[in-house]
Amino acid sequence: MNSQKDQSARYCLNNDRGMEVEIASKGGSIERLIVPDRNGHPENIMFDCSLVTVPAIPRGLSGRLYDTSSGSVHEIDLALHQLLFTAEPFSTIQESGLRLSAEISVNGQVIAIDMLYVLTNNNQLILRYAATTNQPLRLSLSLPVFFNLSGNLKASITKHDLKFSSSCFIHPVPALSINPCLQQTKGTPFDFRLGRRLNRFFLDKMFSRSPADTYYLFHQQPVISVHEAVSGRWMTMETSQPGFVLSTAAHHTDTFFSGICFDSTDFLLSSLINGPIPSFHETTYSFSTTY
């Protein structure tokens, strides 16, 4: 296992099984994610969301502060995707990794952010988020990544099979509210408990636009499974967060089939950081193939 830095402040993590992850110290974005297919051919399984212009999707870490003192919700975007982090690469026999850290001040609130990226020889990419503050506040941290398991964008995501256990959802994710309205997935196109192919989801007549930005609350196991049959790639995502936002994106405004994102995040405004006590959560992506 090793990690390398290039002149553009990008760091490459790789393992002994052909996986590579390229990370930028500016914004903490994952620039490339190389995963071999069932025949051992390495390909990039990421969709570059920076190519999307309408609506614009920032590439990199997302951080937001929420103020509810007035009875309504006020959101402050920390613009972490534009922040230059201090980077510390490391490696062991079993894994390679990168630690990104930064401290920012917003209206007298000092926030220390520590982000850890770990690639293991078991083909797991682990993202660990930590933050401390000088006073209690509501803060969300996440790293949206858009996937296309066909590899090098050879095909759309319509033939991806998706499965996860969720009995409640919010669609679309509303303007911020303290008490959002949850709906039951049972009997709706949003029910993925038994697994569904994405083209059936996208073609449902209830969608007049992209079925993006749907929040799902996990039921029982916080695990998502995705399979692409042609390449044989499997991806599972497991997180310590209670739910995630499902989003889709594409190069062109007339379709939304190029990439899919599972942005693990707390249930809207339920997260509260208590000063010097670190807020911590973790998301793990595991990759394998079928023959």
Would you name each region that the model predicts?
Residues 1-291:
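Surface-exposed acidic/polar loop and edge beta-strand patches at domain peripheries
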